[in-house]
Design a protein with these regions (language model features):
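Alpha-helical packing segments of well-folded alpha/beta enzyme cores
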Residues: 7, 40, 64, 71, ...
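The feature captures the catalytic groove of carbohydrate-active enzymes
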Residues: 4-6, 13, 17, 93-109, ...
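Well-ordered alpha-helical scaffold segments within catalytic/enzyme domains
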Residues: 49-53, 70-75, 115-126, 187-201, ...
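Active-site core of glycosidic bond-cleaving carbohydrate-active enzymes
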Residues: 106, 111-138, 189, 207, ...
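Non-catalytic C-terminal accessory modules of carbohydrate-active enzymes
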Residues: 172, 375-503
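A ubiquitous short alpha-helical element
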Residues: 26-33, 174-179, 249, 348
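Helix-terminus loop motifs that line ligand-binding clefts
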Residues: 76-101, 127-189, 195-196, 201-205, ...
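Acidic/polar, glycine-enriched structural segments that form the non-catalytic walls/loops
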Residues: 1-104, 498-503
Length: 503
């Protein structure tokens, strides 16, 4: 017979109220130890019913998926409190529990939150994704100071952020602090995803959402103007560190530059949604800069060099730390021919450090799924989690060797993206939601419970031959179902089951 351990924690800014809450909890335990446990179960059941991923006929893999989502959710604000919630200060790579001096990234917030943890949460728990973005809105004054200090317009976010939103990257990595400017593009892309998934006009119009988007675009416009090239008649973004941190300072990172272009382009779209009348001259300036930011591309080899001059690099500098240029295919979803996508994957697979972080291999898996190569996708999918998970509690480590950040929720977020956007086939576009699922090897299918889009919730069951879709919650936004082999639109009504061939 196993023992049941009950742990009570009360957290409140007011000591007296905190003590009262803790005493009330103690009384409940004394009165009925099962009562607290049942309340705990009920709270988590409601959370899971709002959004989860079920794996069919593979218990161990189910535990891994549930565990990954659980560890991220417990680091996010509670949705059932007796008091108004305080400002949320973001997710660190090691979650809320980790962050000692010079270990586990000291609890600081990086691009990890928006790029790796946020996308899966947005599709399953959009209210929590909004809370994640709220940290960046809260820290806009500090981001504005960061931009002004560099001589730029708008807002520039720090590589490592803390409770004030100021730059807190330690001196052990000054190049990271100064050169990893892509984080502002990453945050802008997260805002783009939020608007695409929710059409939250209140957030855009009255909660500073549009200002947030506009000011990030303003930073990129001024940043690109600094490096205008009269010879090529293109805007450059020089002196940056890309996601591949083995490159300290390079020019025209393909990932950074595409992030900048997308940020500026979306600002005009967001202005229309928000009903904001921007100056025509400003709009024209945005368009000119966005259209003319240089994107490295080899016409001869038909692939995206990681940065300008990449093809001339030799020796150790040719080794890539982690996924970089392949991120242009996903999550950035930059339009490219199939052969270019394939060439990017094949080239960078050969030169990526095989001891790198888990997220890298998940992005390769997603890429190969896009191209229909199930064997390659399976190979990289297995590599994206197997070496990083520690039993028995499914705790992840940053490195395969077990060192680095512990309970590495960044890796868990990347893994969940491979499940949801890779095998789930979900693609969140600005004007539509697409999905083209595949069966995860070793399972008989999956179920997406509470997939949220425009205020509607969907349950989607994916089997080998059939896909079942049910709308479980409706909003003022009606959503139509259009299959790839038909131009006929089916209006999704609540409770009505749609069965589709999964071929």
């Amino acid at each position: 017979m196993s023992d049941r351990w009950i742990s009570l924690v009360a957290i409140d800014p007011a000591k007296e109220r905190c003590e009262l809450d803790f005493s009330a909890g103690q009384r409940d335990v004394v009165a009925d130890t099962n009562l607290v446990y049942l309340r705990h179960l009920d709270a988590w059941s409601k959370k899971w019913d709002n959004g989860r991923i079920e794996i069919k006929d593979n218990l161990q893999f189910s535990k891994l998926v549930y565990g990954s989502l659980y560890y991220i959710l417990i680091s996010l604000p509670s949705d059932s409190t007796y008091l108004p919630t305080n400002q949320f200060f973001g997710l660190s790579p090691g979650g809320l529990a980790n962050g000692a001096n010079f270990t586990d990234y000291q609890g600081h917030v990086f691009w990890d939150m928006e790029t790796w943890m946020y996308p899966g949460i947005l599709m399953l728990h959009p209210e929590l994704a909004k809370a994640m973005l709220s940290y960046r809105l809260f820290s806009m004054p500090a981001a504005r100071e960061r931009a002004v200090a560099g001589g730029y317009d708008g807002i520039r976010y720090p590589w490592e952020g803390g409770s004030t939103g100021a730059e807190v990257t330690p001196d052990i990595c000054i190049p990271c602090r100064e050169n990893q400017q892509h984080i502002t593009g990453d945050i802008a892309f997260a805002a783009r995803q939020y608007v695409s998934a929710t059409r939250d006009l209140q957030w855009l119009q009255t909660e500073m959402g549009y200002e947030f988007i506009r000011e990030m675009a303003a930073f990129w416009v001024s940043r690109a103007e600094e490096d205008w090239n009269n010879d090529t008649m293109m805007y450059n973004i020089n002196g940056v560190m890309p996601p591949d941190e083995y490159q300290i300072s390079i020019n025209n990172s393909v990932y950074t530059n595409i992030g900048a272009k997308l940020s500026i382009m979306f600002a005009e779209y967001a202005a229309c949604l928000a009903g904001t009348a921007e100056d025509n001259a400003m709009i024209e300036k945005w368009r000119h800069v966005a259209e003319n930011i240089y994107v490295p591309f080899s016409e001869f080899k038909r692939y995206h060099p990681e940065f300008e001059g990449f093809e001339d690099v030799t020796g150790d500098r040719k080794i890539i730390k982690q996924a970089d240029a392949i991120l242009t295919g996903f999550p950035q979803m930059w339009s490219m021919p199939e052969d270019v996508r394939r060439n990017d994957l094949e080239l960078y697979e050969k030169i990526t450090d095989h001891g790198g972080p888990a997220m890298t291999w998940g992005m390769f898996s997603i890429g190969w799924l896009e191209l229909g190569d199930k064997n390659k996708a399976r190979e990289f999918f297995h590599k994206s989690y197997s070496p990083y998970v520690r039993e028995p509690f499914k705790v992840w480590t940053e490195a395969q060797s077990g060192i680095g950040a512990v309970n590495f929720i960044t890796g868990m977020g990347g893994f969940l993206q491979t499940v949801l956007f890779g095998y789930g086939g979900v693609r969140l576009r600005v004007e539509k939601l697409e999905f083209d699922p595949e069966i995860i090897p070793g399972t008989s299918g999956m179920r997406l419970v509470g997939l949220d889009y425009l205020g509607n919730s969907l349950n989607i069951d994916v089997y080998e031959e059939v896909i079942k879709i049910v709308k479980t919650k409706a909003s003022e936004h009606t959503i139509d179902l259009v299959t790839s082999d038909s131009k006929i639109k089916f209006i999704l009504h609540s409770g009505k089951i749609f069965l589709l061939n999964n071929v």
